[in-house]
Amino acid sequence: MKDPQSPNESFDIIVIGGGHAGCEAAITTAKLGFSTALFTINLDRIAWQPCNPAVGGPAKSQLVHEIDALGGIIGQLADETAIQKRILNASRGPAVWALRAQTDKREYSKRMIEILQNTDNLSLKEAMITELVIKEAETFSNNLKNKTKKIKGVKTFFGTYYYAKSIIITAGTFLEGRIWIGNKSMSAGRSGEQAAQGLTQSLHNLGIKTERLKTGTPARVDKKSISFDELDIQPSTASDKYFSFDPKIKNNMPQVSCHITRTTLKTHELIRNNLHLTPIYGGFIDSKGPRYCPSIEDKIVKFADKNSHQIFLEPEGINTPEIYVQGFSTGLPENIQLDLLRTLPGLNKCKMLRPAYAVEYEYIPATQLKSSLETIEIENLFSAGQINGTTGYEEAAAQGLVAGINATRKLNMKDPIIFSRESSYIGTMINDLITRDLKEPYRVLTSRSEYRLTLRGDNADRRLTPLGFEIGLIDERRWLAHKKKMKSLKEENSRLENTRLKCTDEIAKKIELDSGSKIKGSTTLKELLKRPNLHYSDFIRYDLVDKTLPISVIEGVEIDIKYEGYLKRQKNNIDQINRQSLKSLSSEINYDQIDTLSLEARENLNKIKPTNFGDASKIPGVSKADLTALLVWLKIKELKNEKKTSFAEKKLSS
């Protein structure tokens, strides 16, 4: 073995973990020209979907659109490997419309591996990283001596040392992971794969604290043993919809149906009688699980008045018999799991291929991170994905992209890219993570955003693709396609605004008859489209629109016009927030004297001494409530100063 001071290999950036966060981070840094190594415990399980074989859903699809708009990869792969697509919340407003894709999990992983293997500047390595290597230096600030810690590299389980200028940890559920079935447990990051040992202790030694969370996954059953004729069918209804804005992305996968069954009174009785055998209710573990993806036993306990719960049966791929039993995760013993499954209609003779299990793991509370996802404690150490306390492939991928972007910018001595709540769901999620003391896995939700009508999936490219191009992740071909779309949107909006119909026109009479809505004198097509009972599909029927216009342009224009008033109000709110962000903060402010601030906010504000309100809003531990309190305090202070000035002027004049 080489001396630890003599590295086996050197890289600009090392990514630890090959899940969805790690893949986005590694591809990002390599595409931006930095030599990158992606380390993972198992190279055959890169970008694996250990739980639900699906991408998207409410708020999650918006995240995927945003990642793609910036130049990330998850949206393209989800589109290419989708075996079913549906639009969720289609009957509601566009702010909550959500695309969801059932993917072929093996095909998804295979294609991601191919992309990684063919990305310039990127090396793949199978090894367990057990130690972070740092170098310490002394700095002076305000005549005070400070010790700083900066990343130098990593060591593997077998003692090999790799040098790196920057590290991104994307370890998922693998840090000291332990899976549970009933009262039996074993060390594992997920079923069939060993946990990551040693790295947690290395983090502790460097001053980064970790805590424990829990998640779980349901059983997989053999589709040949299911009576599908007893189940409700759920076909693919949106195969023409895409996460990616790249016009070259296509899907050639066969489309399949999912099916729906329900729990029965017998299911509930069996669960209640065996609650004491589960890891949580039996007292074997006390880690918090995800609120929005509860186990079936949690549902039975917390919603005791419900006689039945919907369960979805989802194929894991085209060439596998495995069916994912969505909504039925459990920690019950294996033999009871099979009995439980057989209480469900259509599954009374089912064969279980893999049992459900719970997994608990170490995570890094994200209040220890900056908005860039760099750790506060150690320079050039970034953290992204489930290790930051989130749940979901989409949340992980978004963080991986952000960490990758900012790791490269730090090495280039550029300011980090900070995503604001007003600009993206990515920004909403990161702001929530670094300012809230979360004690359960975090899932992105549309309700978490104050600007959800502005932050839709369909306009993610309008919001973020210029930034992706500026960073260097959107290539010239994508950029030209984006500019062409923007031109089409502008031209179509202008055409609708300037095309008038007279009430005497034949087509106007037909519109009046069909819609039951009178046209007085004359009106523009734009004004017509604002009416709730008229849509672009009607314009196409009346031959009032170019039928060759892409669906993305048609949808974008219609939403912009129908919700114009709401969008203007939301834009005004955002502009006001942006103006507030420029409000200066004196370095003389003693935040300990502002009683309305939380203790953590006072401590961090005093430590960092932000120069303006915008910088204060990016400090970990400073919540939205703290920012409001600070604004009120500043306003009161301004009023007091105005009164003092006015009083002094009166004295002088007298």
From Swiss-Prot:
A GO BP annotation: tRNA wobble uridine modification
GO molecular function: flavin adenine dinucleotide binding
Listed transmembrane segments: none
Coarse class of the protein's main subcellular location: cytoplasm
Binding-site residues, FAD: G17, G18, G19, H20, A21, G22
Binding site for NAD(+): 289-303
Annotated SUPFAM superfamilies: FAD/NAD(P)-binding domain (SSF51905)
Pfam families: GIDA (PF01134), GIDA_C_1st (PF21680), SAM_GIDA_C (PF13932)
Keywords on record: Cytoplasm, FAD, Flavoprotein, NAD, tRNA processing
Matches recorded under NCBIfam families: mnmG_gidA (TIGR00136)
Subunit structure: Homodimer. Heterotetramer of two MnmE and two MnmG subunits.
Family as reported in the entry's similarity comment: Belongs to the MnmG family.
Known function: NAD-binding protein involved in the addition of a carboxymethylaminomethyl (cmnm) group at the wobble position (U34) of certain tRNAs, forming tRNA-cmnm(5)s(2)U34.
HAMAP family listed in its UniProt record: MnmG_GidA (MF_00129)
Name of this protein: tRNA uridine 5-carboxymethylaminomethyl modification enzyme MnmG
Gene that specifies this protein: mnmG
